């Protein structure tokens, strides 16, 4: 059986080549591209300016990735929406819509599961199942935009998975998401997270994109980082920070450091002092995240007073710092709470 072409993962030039290989005119590619990336149709039959013969050929030769919305949970606290989407193979992923005054932001998953093993994160509990394709990552945004009838203005790749562990597909996703012929989201409105895969961070830097890189730091010493994040067994903290500096040098984009505060683990005065020394002189922003509970782990959130104390210590040393607003916590839609499910679990 011949494998069908995942047309929604093709850029316009690749789509043109595919159409030419079918004996079609090149301009057809632009029409199909707009149907997929602007109108977000769910079938080839909806592409009404194509001939019936071409639509039938596309059904035979191509695959139009469409995610099925299985469940939407809405937070009673802040209106955050968590979407459960079914993939064609029966796996499921979660995505989150957050509404702000400045626009609508979507947090997307990059993998089914994750193999990084961060101790406070639900996404990694079952390990890595597979990478998501560029079209499956895009589809999370398209389905949510169609669901709410409003434009998505910001995207954060911080759902299930380690984006840099799915590097090629993430880079292609960025290309498609920011393309002027598609949704055309500004690179500056896109944030990609990583737990610190140094070679991939440098590779991304060399592309000189204008996206924000968010490093999951979570500790100010190598030993504590190893305790919380197994990836620290592969890369020293100094290597990771050097990669962050390299990213800034290449792109001019300020680095965001994500720091989950775990009660009694990484929230002491000494931790704050080490963190100050660690990022001193760097053009960065620190996002403090009160760790969110997951039932399989016994980590607890730092006391509110400790969080404020930690923040004040950083501010007094001239560091740009904020405490992340906890959105969607009551529906397990907050940072570290997204997980891989299979269709049989819903």
Where are these regions (language model features)?
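Conserved AdoMet/S-adenosylmethionine-binding subsite of the radical SAM
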Residues: 145-154, 159-317
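Canonical Radical SAM [4Fe-4S] cluster-binding loop centered on the CxxxCxxC motif
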Residues: 99-136
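P-loop NTP-binding catalytic core
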Residues: 89-98, 102-103
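Auxiliary Fe-S-binding modules of radical SAM enzymes
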Residues: 1-93, 245-254, 259-346
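Generic beta-strand structural signal
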Residues: 81, 93, 104-108, 116, ...
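Short linear Ser/Thr-Pro motifs
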Residues: 75, 109-110, 123, 193, ...
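Conserved alpha-helical substructure of the radical SAM core
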Residues: 124-154
């Amino acid at each position: 059986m011949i494998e069908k072409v995942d047309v929604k993962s093709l850029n316009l030039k690749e789509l043109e080549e595919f159409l030419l290989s079918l004996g079609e005119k090149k301009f057809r590619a632009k029409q199909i591209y707009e149907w997929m990336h602007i109108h977000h149709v769910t079938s080839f039959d909806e592409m009404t300016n194509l001939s019936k013969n071409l639509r039938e050929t596309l059904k035979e030769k191509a695959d139009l990735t469409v995610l099925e919305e299985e469940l939407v949970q809405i937070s009673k606290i802040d209106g955050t929406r968590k979407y459960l989407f079914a993939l064609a193979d029966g796996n499921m992923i979660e995505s989150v819509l957050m509404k702000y005054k400045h626009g609508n932001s979507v947090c997307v998953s990059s993998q089914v599961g994750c193999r990084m093993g961060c101790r406070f994160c639900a996404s990694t509990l079952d390990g890595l199942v597979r990478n998501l394709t560029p079209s499956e990552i895009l589809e999370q945004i398209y389905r949510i935009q169609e669901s709410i009838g409003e434009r998505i203005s910001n995207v954060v790749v911080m759902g299930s998975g380690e984006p840099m562990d799915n590097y090629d597909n993430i880079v292609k996703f960025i290309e498609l998401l920011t393309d002027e012929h598609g949704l055309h989201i500004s690179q500056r409105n896109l944030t990609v997270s990583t737990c610190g895969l140094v070679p991939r961070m440098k590779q991304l830097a060399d592309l000189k994109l204008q996206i924000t890189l968010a490093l999951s730091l979570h500790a100010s010493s190598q030993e504590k980082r190893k305790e919380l994040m197994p990836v620290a067994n592969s890369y020293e903290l100094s290597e990771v920070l050097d990669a962050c500096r390299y990213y800034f040098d290449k792109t001019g984009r300020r680095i965001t450091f994500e720091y989950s505060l775990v009660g009694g683990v990484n929230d002491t005065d000494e931790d704050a002092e080490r963190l100050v020394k660690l990022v001193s002189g760097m053009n960065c922003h620190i996002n403090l995240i009160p760790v969110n509970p997951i039932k399989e782990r016994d980590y607890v959130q730092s006391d509110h007073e400790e969080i404020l104390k930690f923040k004040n210590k950083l501010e007094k040393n001239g560091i740009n710092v904020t405490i992340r607003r906890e959105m969607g916590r009551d529906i397990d839609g907050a940072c570290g709470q997204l997980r891989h499910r299979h269709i049989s679990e819903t």
